UniProtKB/Swiss-Prot annotation:
Residue sites binding Fe cation per the record: 207, 209, 257
Subcellular location: Nucleus
GO biological process: base J metabolic process
Family in the record: Belongs to the TET family. JBP1 subfamily.
Required co-factors: Fe(2+)
Protein name per its UniProtKB record: Thymine dioxygenase JBP1-B
Cofactor note (record): Binds 1 Fe(2+) ion per subunit.
Spans annotated as Thymine dioxygenase: 80-282
Function: Dioxygenase that catalyzes the first step of DNA base J (beta-d-glucosyl-HOMedU) biosynthesis by converting thymine to 5-hydroxymethyluracil (HOMedU). DNA base J is a hypermodified thymidine residue found in the genome of kinetoplastid parasites, which is localized primarily to repetitive DNA, namely the telomeres, and is implicated in the regulation of antigenic variation. Also specifically binds to base J-containing DNA (J-DNA).
Region of interest (DNA-binding JBP1 domain), ranges: 409-578
Amino acid sequence: MKQKRGKQDVKMVESAPPQLLPKKGRLEISELAPQQRTIRTAEEIEMAYNEAVRKHPFYDNADHTIDFHDATVFRDARGVVGGVLLPGALPAFAATMAADVLRPAAVRTSLRSNMFGGFAPLSGIAGYFDYRGSPVELKCRKTSFTYENVHSWPNVFPMIDYVSAIYKAVFPERWAAQDAAVPDIVRIHGSPFSTLTVNQQFRTASHTDAGDFDMGYGLLAVLEGKFEGLSLALDDFGVCFRMQPRDVLIFNTHFFHSNTEPELNHPKDDWSRLTCVCYYRAALGEPACVAEYERRLARAKEIGASPPPAVDAILQKDNGNNFNKPAPTFTYSLTPFGGAASICSLHCCTAKLLRLHELLLENPTLEVILFGESLRTDDGLPRREKEQLISVHLPVVVKMSPSGGFSELGGALKAAEEKQYFFEEKYLADELGPDLMSMWTQSRAHWLRLVKEDWERLCRRDPERTKFTWNNSSAMNAAFFDLCEVAKQMMIGLLNKETPSSAENHSFWILFAAHLNYACTTENGMPRDAVGMHKLNVKLKDFHFGGTRYLKDMPPEEQERRLERKKRIEEARRRGNAARETHTDNWLLNDTFDYQQEDRKVEFEENGWMTPEAYVKHLGLKPCGDVTAAASPTEPIHVLVVLPRPAAAAPKDVKRDVPLATSEESIRLLMNPAAQRVLTGKARNVTLPSPLSFGGVKITVLFDGDDIDCIHPDFVVLQHLLAAIEEDEAAKARVKYWAHVARYCVFVVETDVRDRRHFLLREEVRVAYEDVAEDCFRSLHAAAYSTKCNRLRTTPSLIALSNSKNIGLRFKFRGSPLNTIALIVVGERLD
């Protein structure tokens, strides 16, 4: 980009925690709000949900066949890349710096409620946006969040630079096309991205990202969080990408995608997740926006704007054809071999895996030989009824606390304690005028001093005391109400509006209380909960409603003094607002040519950080090449299937020990047609089949423990072997052993005793299932393999046996009567 002025070099530093920013809704912090902030009837909630999911349904993990865990390149049936998963690809410091800036960008917005079951999610945009179809009069410019956070915005740049370098390394041609199309004045820090979408605790329903550049990809980065599940799913393809903080996913945002359910032990458990999607908003390169840039530039030159424009002229680039429609999907039947072919660490054997994938599709009977059952069973475990599952949004309606107090339910108190630093002076100074900041500092210090004096007096009477006694007629109480008056004006000043919303009130006052409670501990040396959040909450409500010894009960001269004090506080707040309104209040009216004024150079080496170019080399990233063809039918491929050794032959007249199917759950598990075939059929490991050959493909079947001196397989399939091994260490040793035997990888095929919709089951259904599941699956396993079933495990425990770092993917056998899964364990990465 041609510049009239040089870029300003600045040393990048770790950004401070997010400030309470002066934008509507910025104080609506999800962790601090009650579980439901508005009152809606059950009928209204149901109606909104049904309307939303009619167009944008939610899909659960059980609705998808493959969960990718490791670095992956997933392609459609025509070989076009749909998604590239890169675990841990984003440097930790860059993720943290970006999170600290972008966290407040995610605000409650009804604009995306159709993707959240009719509820307003926490979501926002940063960078540049066209505002096409929006009532905002001035288009094609910085988002309000970027405008209001221009000073901290450069701390996002390291993340942007790394993500851009990753994109360029993996898809150089797509990166170049996107880079060539994006107008220079709306690109974020020289990247091919114009816009960021920031989501917080947002499980999206199925959707496409209309408006993204058709010839490029979007890049999803998980910046921070404590969560399990919430995989990014490509819904039409039946695949999920499991992600954790610092993971990056490059994917076609024009495919329908969504998030699977959060995996919580209890529906009300706390979880957090902050993500950022980087993309080019194609409308910013269309003629209408280019005309807007030209108009603003001409005006800036006419008035001699200072600082001067970053460019001399606006160039209309070739923006390609952007249809804002879902991309065509070319799906194919999924198999464990086809899924494994997508795993990057198995690229050396991709051709062989694709040959096995083709062979399975050509000969479906091989599924039973290799895995013990078909990949899909239509009459097996039936799908759960809607009534057995919890709602996406819990049907809990909590009445909002009156303004001035806060709800003490759920995880709000814990979240407030973690964020109490919002009220520290260094984070408020830039948002409030000096007069109001001085009042806050002095009032806070005065109240803390009086609290300390009262506490020391109480402790002299009782040295073992742990709780503070609040005297409603004390000077400390009066100082607290005075401090609340200052805080109230701070809230109005921060939000820049006289009437904050209920959620903003709630978030502000719970943070305020958490900060004071923390200060009593750290500055006054009091026990952690000596004052306590509950007591502060009660006093805040006293303040709001004119409680004991407040204004209406005070002598006339004291009332007059306090009213005068309140007036001075309001004036201080207004002076502070006036001082900053040129930067914050005027976003709607901002008609300047301020594009790229926020750009700064990132001093990577000065800060001791790897440059993006060096970093992608460090990661070993290479361009996604052409589609790998399946190996020729004559190429030698050896698959070894290992079965559990059967128990000693039992008399034919001895009946199998099958539990009675008396409960609804046991009937579901044992009485479906596929389960009945298992219970009445022949065991799969009574006799070993002879080796099979299909051209160059050889399949050998043997028992665990047999001599394998002359066998050197490419792939090993362990067919329900671990269920016969009770001790985890022994089971882990068998997986490790067979992983060393396999030239490439091992397919661990086992029963998952956990219900596929475990995290969605109503509590009573989950309890009923868990009461009978183990006994039922033991019977099914004994019938299928004629061996004692010593230990059934869940997916997490099976992953633990194989070392989670070695897991490439999980494949779920659809409708399997044994609830079978296959884990791909990459042998070459084992110790």
